[in-house]
């Protein structure tokens, strides 16, 4: 029958979901994202892998490169049914992001290629490869509730000392009196 994993990729920072990024059959998953941006951009990607355990004992880790530089991908939740990964990184203009589980060239050629223009808020599948990929934007509410919950994000952010969560900061017009702001609450 063959191995059939399921991989969904959520580009949280751009509210784009790429569904079924796995190969039709085989123990491999990944894609190429051509990101077009005119400025520096903080990116957050969540990967949801639902492994097919019928013929394998372990799953291959998801790896990622942005313009040839390795990017950390961290497991934030793991169960028998799914493995959820997260990655936060910054791009500085146009970038090519390779997401993969295999490094051999033959397998990588089967991965889909997606263009995402951040400035114009447009995306398109250039090559679907050997997948049934489709794109949703915005990310549907069920996926947001299931995979983008605060406890996942907090757990990931707390494990990364270099990551600053700007949403937790108290910014207001008179930024000099944060202690007074806490007293008023």
From Swiss-Prot:
Record InterPro entries: Poxvirus_C7/F8A
GO BP terms: viral process
Keyword Transport found: no
Pfam families: Pox_C7_F8A (PF03287)
Top-level taxon of origin: Viruses
Keywords, alphabetical: Early protein
Family: Belongs to the poxviridae C7 protein family.
Role noted for this protein: Plays a role for multiplication of the virus in different cell types.
Protein's name according to its UniProt entry: Probable host range protein 2
């Amino acid at each position: 029958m063959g191995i059939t994993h399921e991989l969904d990729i959520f580009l949280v920072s751009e509210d784009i979901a790429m569904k079924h990024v796995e190969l039709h059959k085989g123990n491999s998953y990944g894609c190429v994202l051509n990101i077009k941006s005119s400025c520096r951009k903080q990116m957050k990607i969540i990967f949801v892998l639902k492994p097919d355990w019928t013929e394998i004992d372990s799953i291959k880790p998801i790896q990622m490169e942005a313009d040839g530089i390795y990017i950390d991908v961290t497991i934030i939740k793991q169960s028998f049914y799914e493995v959820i990964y997260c990655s936060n990184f910054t791009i500085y203009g146009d970038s090519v992001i390779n997401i993969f589980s295999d490094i051999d060239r033959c397998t990588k050629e089967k991965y889909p290629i997606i263009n995402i223009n951040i400035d114009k808020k447009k995306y398109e599948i250039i090559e679907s490869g050997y997948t049934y990929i489709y794109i949703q934007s915005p990310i549907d509410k069920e996926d947001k509730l299931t995979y983008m919950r605060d406890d996942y994000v907090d757990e990931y952010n707390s494990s990364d000392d270099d990551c600053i969560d700007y949403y937790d900061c108290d910014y207001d017009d008179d930024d000099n009196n944060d202690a007074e702001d806490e007293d008023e609450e």
